[in-house]
Amino acid sequence: MKVLTPAALILLFFFYTVDARTREYTSVITVPNGGHWGKWGIRQFCHSGYANGFALKVEPSQFGRDDTALNGIRLRCLDGSVIESLVGKWGTWTSFLVCPTGYLVSFSLRSEKSQGGGDDTAANNIQFRCSDEAVLVGDGLSWGRFGPWSKRCKICGLQTKVESPQGLRDDTALNNVRFFCCK
């Protein structure tokens, strides 16, 4: 039986500890109507290939109390794995919507502008266009409006911007998202 050299052990350790945050990407796609509250989570990537579906974490209307609407986005990768970045604490996950064939190539975010002294929700829903031209509209809420479509690319990762709970002040949860593109 051959004994591994220290260099071989280090390389072996490196390849087994590479995770979904370390994949190389070629570009980032964004849209101009994301909210500004919160902090960016960590980047998450499909281990290989691209994303072909998504699910949303949505808090339904609170009927006059503090609404947050969209709290999280999960991507389903072609290999069946699921990735997510930072997620808000409210709501439940919807079922996955998946491209009939192909993968996700662009997105449009539904957001509500600042309500001044009223109840802000920021991002409410998202829709994606697939490489086969199908459009998948998320099961989020209908406040605000969908903004412009992003540029097109092969989506392989995401990073979300989420506001942490504000105690007795107004909560918004998910405010913005950026998607990463791979070759």
UniProtKB/Swiss-Prot annotation:
Q: Which UniProt keywords apply?
A: Disulfide bond, Secreted, Signal
Its domain of life?
A: Eukaryota
Name the cystine pairs: 46-77, 99-130, 153-181, 156-182
Pfam families membership:
VOMI
The record, for InterPro entries, names: VOMI (IPR005515), VOMI_sf (IPR036706)
Q: In the record, which residues are listed under signal peptide?
A: 1-20
What the entry lists under SUPFAM superfamilies is as follows: Vitelline membrane outer protein-I (VMO-I)
Q: What are the annotated GO cellular component locations?
A: extracellular space
Q: Which family does it belong to?
A: Belongs to the VMO1 family.
Q: What is this protein called?
A: Vitelline membrane outer layer protein 1
Task: Please give the organism.
Answer: Gallus gallus
The gene coding this protein: VMO1
